[in-house]
Amino acid sequence: MKSFNTEGHNHSTAESGDAYTVSDPTKNVDEDGREKRTGTWLTASAHIITAVIGSGVLSLAWAIAQLGWIAGTSILLIFSFITYFTSTMLADCYRAPDPVTGKRNYTYMDVVRSYLGGRKVQLCGVAQYGNLIGVTVGYTITASISLVAVGKSNCFHDKGHTADCTISNYPYMAVFGIIQVILSQIPNFHKLSFLSIMAAVMSFTYATIGIGLAIATVAGGKVGKTSMTGTAVGVDVTAAQKIWRSFQAVGDIAFAYAYATVLIEIQDTLRSSPAENKAMKRASLVGVSTTTFFYILCGCIGYAAFGNNAPGDFLTDFGFFEPFWLIDFANACIAVHLIGAYQVFAQPIFQFVEKKCNRNYPDNKFITSEYSVNVPFLGKFNISLFRLVWRTAYVVITTVVAMIFPFFNAILGLIGAASFWPLTVYFPVEMHIAQTKIKKYSARWIALKTMCYVCLIVSLLAAAGSIAGLISSVKTYKPFRTMHE
């Protein structure tokens, strides 16, 4: 085992996880001294699809059921456009001041610091990393639910659909955590391409299975009642439930597209030719278009199949029972997808902390030293003791939080509401205005500001709906006792 110390690195350009020395002329590096980026629009598209298409795609039938055919499909299309539009603005801000030849910004906070500065940098950090932490906890819960669904599906198949097949989530959360401890040793975002491509394939697979099962239900004629306005007050829901669930549904759709939290980190993996902003815009178009296609299919066909009684997730909530083996496979695909998605959202957190520690403690060998070891089938691998301890601790903590708060998805909705507006809409628009020097009160300025305020209202209403759902969950909460029934 060979040890080497990185304390001589230029910490303004090298972060933990980079296995090269900036001054080493024998290494293949970019103009900023970092390891040469090799990403393309295709790998960036895979990262985006992995980040965006979560198992929530299977809950869109429920969202459309709350809103109806007209509002549901319209909101899906509107937010797909808003997300793509603002992502192109953010892609142009990766370099500053010029989007092609300017200085690179490696994180979302760096971008905000370059264009806006002041307290907005801290606001961005709180929104971004709060969201990333929340997502990693939420994915731990969701993955365990999918794995539990596999066991329950087999139980229902063997004992009948009315059998008591209650299974605890906690062992599955522990297994998911162990897998993440291992994968978290992947040094940085640049090494995640294979994981994202695999996760993207999994997301296509389970979404396609869900769509296929919904089509089969519609073709069989056993469909639920649908309407232009969704669930009916006095029949399906009370007036209060209609309001709160509609708010929550709008928020779910809006947040389902959000990937601004990791956009800059994804763009930082792209090679410089063609220009990163051009490649990222192409990746965003492919990613958002693909996502919208699957969202509309899952949402609309799922609503057509189940009507106003559409379940929250028609795979894990057993909208379907047969064929059980296909449902097992789809739920396993969800779990595998979330294994990759967890890393896409966790890597920016890992690198943020490691970069800070390298800067603050450059002489601490525990933090700066790395060891070169030979790993079977993988070849030479650089291991940092600090990275091993810190990342393992993070995974353990998020897993324990997931076990303590199994209703955390309600909290995640609230976190999504709080972070969607600043990260996906406000900061990209404000930086675009600053970068292109749009005149105040011009037609374009007014249009951009109007979009900002409309999205702010959506976030506030969604937050209200999430709080109502959270209050309902807390009333029945029992720590370490909640089972997936």
Curated annotation (Swiss-Prot):
pH relationship of activity: Optimum pH is acidic.
Topology Cytoplasmic: residue spans: 1-40, 83-129, 188-194, 267-285, 340-394, 437-450
Phenotype seen when the gene is deleted: No effect on plant growth or seed germination, but reduced seed weight and total seed yield. Resistant to toxic concentrations of amino acids in the growth medium.
Keyword Transmembrane appears in the UniProt entry: yes
Reported regulation of activity: Inhibited by carbonylcyanide m-chlorophenylhydrazone and diethylpyrocarbonate (DEPC).
Residue ranges that the UniProt entry lists as topological domain Extracellular: 151-166, 216-245, 307-318, 472-485
GO biological process: one example: L-alanine transport
Keyword Membrane applies: yes
CC terms in the record's Gene Ontology section: plasma membrane
Main location: membrane
Membrane topology: Multi-pass membrane protein
PANTHER family, per the entry: OS05G0424000 PROTEIN-RELATED
Function according to Swiss-Prot or TrEMBL: Amino acid-proton symporter. Stereospecific transporter with a broad specificity for histidine, glutamate and neutral amino acids. Reduced affinities for asparagine and valine. Involved in amino acid uptake from the apoplastic cavity into the embryo cells for storage protein accumulation and in root amino acid uptake.
Protein name, per record: Amino acid permease 1
